[in-house]
Amino acid sequence: MDYIQTLFTSVNQVGEKIDSYKSSLNLINPGTCENLSKEVSKDILLSNYAFTGVRADVTKGFCTSPWFTVSHAFALGSQVLPPYSFSTMFGGEPLFLRGSVDNDGAVQAMLNCTWNSNVLSKVQMQLSNGAVPNMCQIEHDHKGKDFSFSFKAMNPWYEEKLTGIYIISLLQSVTPKLSLGVEALWQKPSSSIGPEEATLSYMTRYNAADWIATAHLNGSQGDVTATFWRKLSPKVEAGVECQLSPVGLNHSAALMTGPKPEGLTSVGVKYEFAQSIYRGQVDSKGRVGVYLERRLAPAITLAFSSELDHPNRNAKVGLGLSLELPGSDEMIQQQQQQLAAQTA
């Protein structure tokens, strides 16, 4: 028993020394692996903003505590968005729920549960009778003082000794500015589809005061993605994303035509003004895109999207309008306060 007690005492002492050393480094939480290059890929580049055709969104809020809204979305001439969809959101502590249904009967639902300020669980489901496959996704995120851990399961099922896609990722701060991460993916489809597959990815992030650099390496296919973000002024940001692949950026096409090294570099800029946000982008394939979002009033937002593909002589244009209708005296008062602050 004395040996066991001595062993546990030694382990505790080692753990205390490690914690003391980590505290002396002044490490911070590095964010999540999913948001490794968020400043470039999600905030500046147009992949999350560009659209085609005409769209309109009408949102009505009923209360703010808990938060409850309903929304109607209309789209014309879009190859991605359905002609009509109805969605609703309900949020409070600790739950947040969102659901939508479109004109084809496709249903999407999401549930977020915040256990505490550092632990978050998510469940997403998609049911459709069309070309889009059904999907169920379970996520769990844990943020520590100097690390972030995430687990994700897509379409998990117990048959054939567990099938689905499972992803585990860890991002750890090693200095106040430098973070290193690893992500493991295990995919096991049913025996009628194909064999199982496992991959490892490695990532790093360097966060300086006014610029951020990231790199991501897919260990199995050799794909490399690097980004650089810089804040040029309080209202202007710029970013660069470079993708390199030894087998081609479109892996499904590479299976049919054979591997072909390919690369793509995108440069983007974001201007943020009091009533509008402008995003512009150009890539190495000769495509130029712009996205402009203008708030005409506290409840009315106008969006314009355009892309010119010079080598292929193709152009895409989109125009959108968002209308937010207050549904309570409290929400009307909030909009009036917002308008007064903007005109002051």
Curated annotation (Swiss-Prot):
Compartments in which it is found: Mitochondrion outer membrane
InterPro entries: Porin_dom_sf (IPR023614), Porin_Euk/Tom40 (IPR027246), Tom40 (IPR037930), Tom40_fungi (IPR005686)
Membrane topology annotation: Multi-pass membrane protein
The entry's keywords: Ion transport, Membrane, Mitochondrion, Mitochondrion outer membrane, Porin, Protein transport, Transmembrane, Transmembrane beta strand, Transport
One annotated GO molecular function: protein transmembrane transporter activity
Domain of life assignment: Eukaryota
Keyword Ion transport: yes
A biological-process GO annotation: monoatomic ion transport
Entry keyword Membrane: yes
GO cellular component, as recorded: mitochondrial outer membrane translocase complex; mitochondrion; pore complex
Similarity comment text for this entry: Belongs to the Tom40 family.
The protein's assembly and partners: Forms part of the preprotein translocase complex of the outer mitochondrial membrane (TOM complex) which consists of at least 8 different proteins (tom5, tom6, tom7, tom20, tom22, tom37, tom40 and tom70). Interacts with mitochondrial targeting sequences.
Function in brief: Channel-forming protein essential for import of protein precursors into mitochondria.
This protein's name: Probable mitochondrial import receptor subunit tom40
